[in-house]
């Protein structure tokens, strides 16, 4: 993809570009005149990008977040003005099945990324996607940026670690790193293993095809929900 340099608003590297949030963020930044580089796992599908008609406007990079060399190559090659880390193992349930893998993906990879930025793009601005799961068992409603973290899952612990690590690199090394604490947000691009898609797909199947029972997790959980397309505007 060729972009006229004089018209660029910035150069954005989006890690996790093929996910729900990455897709909406890519469209938003492209609309603002950015050159967008998309970091993705090798072999991952671009079906969301095809739906939003941005697949031909993104420069894709296959990045292994467990490999510091892979991250270094991506950052040094693109020299981004802004980096958005939306890549994560996003299933709380899956984090109990593989806590080590979750910590590796959601925490250690962030250290690799911060070190890469410090070495190859110290002037770039980093956005790290944090999660309301970090609050865990809460005593205060609603929560704020100063509410104490009480993580209740490997996923939440990993997210807290990444959140604090970005803070440390900002204060110790002077990197421009910030975290956005995201609460639940959905869209038609959400994967079907998440609760709202489970419910809507299950209802549709039962209405039209007499589908199977809908299996859900904790029915006592209470969450705020937003639209992913709105959330990424806050990120960008």
Task: Give, region by region, the residue ranges found by the protein language model.
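NAD(P)-dependent short-chain dehydrogenase/reductase
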Residues: 139-142, 164-236
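N-terminal Rossmann-like NAD(P)+-binding domain of SDR-like oxidoreductases, especially those catalyzing
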Residues: 1-185
